[in-house]
């Protein structure tokens, strides 16, 4: 790694204070975030390959001693339980809450959402007539896409958000879909004897800790010839928790509450094959994620006043609280762009893996 471009020295509290008061423009914000991310890269990259392997293996072994999931409740309440109208005003048409796939330079966010869903179906080898389970289904974009494309598939979404369950079921009814179910449950606590032909896990691994326990649980829902498709954000080389590196790291703890987010390396899930075997493995360049969050930011800025009005009732009419939520969403978008566009998208990216049951 080269030298890090220095920024104005101030405490994490001072930086956050200026951010929340609206005193940091996007240009400065990008520089401040890049500084923290470059420190992360210097921390994560080791001087020899053996040292890198040992560093990663120590991290992987530490996960096996933890509980299944991180402390995601605060993040869920802050992000996923926002009013659906807020997502409609800031995200794409299907309100996909993870990275999209931009086939062309001219692709819109709506087109990138659909291309992403198409890619998932292709790589998961979904065929008409199968039973499909989407873990952490969000607003149901993928559930509804699969249900419409494969009329004889029965598609089940699983989410711990009541708001999301209600939205998906209403959309399925509007579309006349009778092949959609949604389960309201925490995946780490949910138990069922039912099995599925395909299991999709998009943007969930990032909120897990003990991957061994998580994949073991998923394997119990896999039919004999089932396939498990996983997509997760990652760094290409090293693993890390998205937590503050030092007392000056204002960014990591602001984006995710402590214990909430895990970024594996692109190949770390290959160390968790007790109950499954890898069939295929891909990476998606980080620029796709960067373009996704940049599109979200632009749409949010365009609809800013409407979003404020949507958020205000749920926050007790507190304008300061509304501004706080919007600042957090915008900072996530700006930060995601900086992070996933570093080195032309070849640092942080998305890994996609296909597993079969052992």
From Swiss-Prot:
Top-level EC class as recorded in UniProt: transferase
Pfam families, sorted: CMAS (PF02353)
E.C. number(s) listed in UniProt: 2.1.1.-
Any one GO molecular function term: (S)-tetrahydroprotoberberine N-methyltransferase activity
Entry GO CC: cytoplasm
Induction trigger: Down-regulated by elicitor treatment.
Localization, UniProt: Cytoplasm
Residues binding S-adenosyl-L-methionine: 98, 136, 160, 164, 186-187, 202
Keywords: Cytoplasm, Methyltransferase, S-adenosyl-L-methionine, Transferase
Pathway the protein takes part in: Alkaloid biosynthesis
Record GO biological process: methylation
Annotated catalysed reactions: (S)-stylopine + S-adenosyl-L-methionine = (S)-cis-N-methylstylopine + S-adenosyl-L-homocysteine; (S)-tetrahydropalmatine + S-adenosyl-L-methionine = (S)-cis-N-methyltetrahydropalmatine + S-adenosyl-L-homocysteine
Gene3D superfamilies: Vaccinia Virus protein VP39
Main localization, broad class: cytoplasm
Keyword Transferase: yes
Family label: Belongs to the CFA/CMAS family.
Function comment: N-methyltransferase with a strict substrate specificity for (R,S)-tetrahydropalmatine or (R,S)-stylopine.
Quaternary organization: Homodimer.
Name of the protein described by the UniProt record: Probable (S)-tetrahydroprotoberberine N-methyltransferase 2
């Amino acid at each position: 790694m080269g030298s890090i471009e220095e920024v104005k020295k101030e405490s994490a509290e001072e930086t956050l204070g200026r951010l929340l008061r609206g005193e940091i423009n996007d240009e400065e914000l990008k520089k401040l975030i890049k500084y923290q991310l470059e420190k992360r890269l210097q921390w994560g990259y080791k001087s020899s390959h053996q040292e890198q392997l040992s560093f990663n293996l120590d991290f992987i072994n530490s996960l096996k001693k933890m509980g299944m999931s991180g402390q995601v409740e605060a993040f869920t309440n802050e992000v996923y339980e926002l009013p659906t109208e807020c997502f409609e005003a800031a995200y794409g048409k299907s309100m996909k809450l993870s990275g999209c796939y931009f086939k062309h330079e001219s692709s819109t966010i709506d087109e990138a959402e659909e291309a992403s869903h198409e890619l998932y179906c292709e790589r998961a080898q979904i065929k008409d007539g199968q039973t499909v389970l989407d873990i952490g289904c969000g607003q149901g974009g993928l559930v509804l896409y699969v249900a419409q494309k494969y009329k004889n598939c029965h598609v089940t979404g699983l989410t711990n958000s009541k708001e999301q369950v209600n939205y998906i079921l209403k959309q399925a009814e509007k579309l006349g879909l009778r092949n959609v179910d949604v389960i309201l449950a925490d995946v780490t606590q949910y138990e069922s004897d039912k099995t599925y032909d395909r299991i999709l896990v998009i943007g969930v691994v990032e909120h897990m800790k003990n991957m061994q326990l998580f994949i073991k649980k998923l394997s119990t829902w896999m039919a004999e010839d089932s396939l498990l498709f996983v997509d997760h954000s990652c760094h290409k080389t090293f693993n890390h928790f998205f937590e503050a590196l030092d007392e000056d790291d204002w960014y990591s703890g602001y984006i995710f509450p402590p214990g909430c987010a895990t970024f594996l390396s692109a190949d770390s899930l290959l160390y968790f094959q007790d109950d499954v075997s890898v069939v295929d493995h891909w990476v998606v360049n980080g620029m796709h994620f960067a373009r996704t969050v940049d599109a979200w930011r632009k749409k949010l800025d365009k609809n800013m006043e409407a979003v404020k009005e949507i958020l205000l009732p749920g926050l007790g009419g507190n304008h300061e609280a509304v501004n706080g939520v919007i600042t957090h969403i915008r900072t996530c978008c700006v930060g995601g762009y900086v992070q996933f566009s570093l080195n032309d998208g070849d640092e942080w990216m998305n890994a996609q893996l296909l597993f079969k049951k052992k």
